[in-house]
Amino acid sequence: MTKSELIERLATQQSHIPAKTVEDAVKDMLEHMASTLAQGERIEIRGFGSFSLHYRAPRTGRNPKTGDKVELEGKYVPHFKPGKELRDRANIYG
């Protein structure tokens, strides 16, 4: 599901709320989450999961075109850990 599809589905389900208001709310929420992570803070949504930053240590990689070794710097990357309720709902085949 894309952001546009999410907005469209929410606007359809909440027909009493203008679609533009739904779009603004979704965009504001995602922007706030991104800026919170950029500040190094953790986000926890009970029953859904948590977002945090994980550190990737410096390492030697390879250029996929040439095969040459490339030194990659350490960096922080976003990480999502699903909550138990989300894991249970997603486990429809188990």
UniProtKB/Swiss-Prot annotation:
Identify the Pfam families for this entry: Bac_DNA_binding
Keyword terms: DNA recombination, DNA-binding, Transcription, Transcription regulation, Translation regulation
Q: Recorded GO terms, molecular function?
A: DNA binding; structural constituent of chromatin
Q: Biological process GO annotation list? A: DNA recombination; regulation of DNA-templated transcription; regulation of translation
**Cellular compartments per GO CC:** chromosome; cytosol
Keyword hit for DNA-binding: yes
Fill in the subunit field for this protein.
Heterodimer of an alpha and a beta chain.
The cross-references to PANTHER family, in alphabetical order and at most eight, read: DNA-BINDING PROTEIN HU, INTEGRATION HOST FACTOR SUBUNIT BETA
User: Which NCBIfam families does the entry link to?
Assistant: hip (TIGR00988), PRK00199.1 (NF001222)
The protein's job, in short, is: This protein is one of the two subunits of integration host factor, a specific DNA-binding protein that functions in genetic recombination as well as in transcriptional and translational control.
Family assignment?
Belongs to the bacterial histone-like protein family.
- This protein is called Integration host factor subunit beta
Q: What is the lineage of its organism?
A: Bacteria, Pseudomonadati, Pseudomonadota, Gammaproteobacteria, Enterobacterales
GN (gene name): ihfB
